[in-house]
Amino acid sequence: MEYKVSAGSQIPNIEISLIDGNTARLYDETSNWILLIVYRGLHCPICRDYATRFEHNLSKLQDMNTQLFFISADPLEKAKIFAEELNLKSKIGYGLGIEEMRKLGLYVSEPRPNEVDYIFPEPALFLINPKGRLHIIEISNAPFIRPDINLILRGINHIQENNYPIRGTH
């Protein structure tokens, strides 16, 4: 069964394994916002660059009470390498399964030769508000489409400062 997430809908309550040995839910009734970045995996150089650029803005996100969270289908060892090589301090989830990918409405790809030996999600970005609702959704079917980081940061700030409503709900 295919799923489509909708603006303003509740984020699917998926439990994610983290590289630090803990688990996390995409919504846990905290007062924090969550910026969830779905990346293709360690094999993707564009993902590496994008993650690094977001991580360089981690303090800005923290100032906006927004937790940065990366997830992929990579196994633990590859997710750890991704985090270590990029010096990521954010939460890093791994082992995203096909059911979780579908619940998030992600595009899923078969690997090409010399990539990986498992299916993986294409990139996505979700801004989850403190009520667990999807405030911003960007889902891509290819690695070449990524929202501009500075625009996302300005958007989060504008949403929070102006109580800007969730758009695209009709």
What role is predicted for each listed range?
Residues 1-170:
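Chalcogenol-based redox active-site neighborhoods
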